Amino acid sequence: IPYGGNGVHHGKAGDSXTVDTAIGNIGNNAASIIGGMISGWASGLAG
């Protein structure tokens, strides 16, 4: 799931707190961090 223009991450919901947040921090964009958490959670549910 793309978010924040900083890339795509497909993973388990448990990844969102680490991987997605790290990607968001690279973008230095609060919206990317929040979007990353949501996308990690959503992709975890989607499998």
From Swiss-Prot:
Thermostable. Retains 100% activity after incubation at 60 degrees Celsius for 60 minutes and 15% after incubation at 121 degrees Celsius for 15 minutes. GO terms for cellular component: extracellular region. Stable between pH 4.0 and pH 8.0. It is found in: Secreted. Its main location: secreted. Keywords: Antibiotic, Antimicrobial, Bacteriocin, Secreted. GO terms for biological process: defense response to bacterium; killing of cells of another organism. Has bactericidal activity against various Gram-negative Campylobacter, and the Gram-positive L.monocytogenes and B.subtilis. In vitro, inhibits C.jejuni strain ATCC 33560 (MIC=27.3 ug/ml). Antimicrobial activity is lost upon treatment with proteinase K, pronase, pepsin, trypsin, chymotrypsin and papain, but not when treated with catalase, lysozyme or lipase. Belongs to the bacteriocin class IIA/YGNGV family. This is Bacteriocin curvaticin DN317. The lineage of its organism: Bacteria, Bacillati, Bacillota, Bacilli, Lactobacillales.
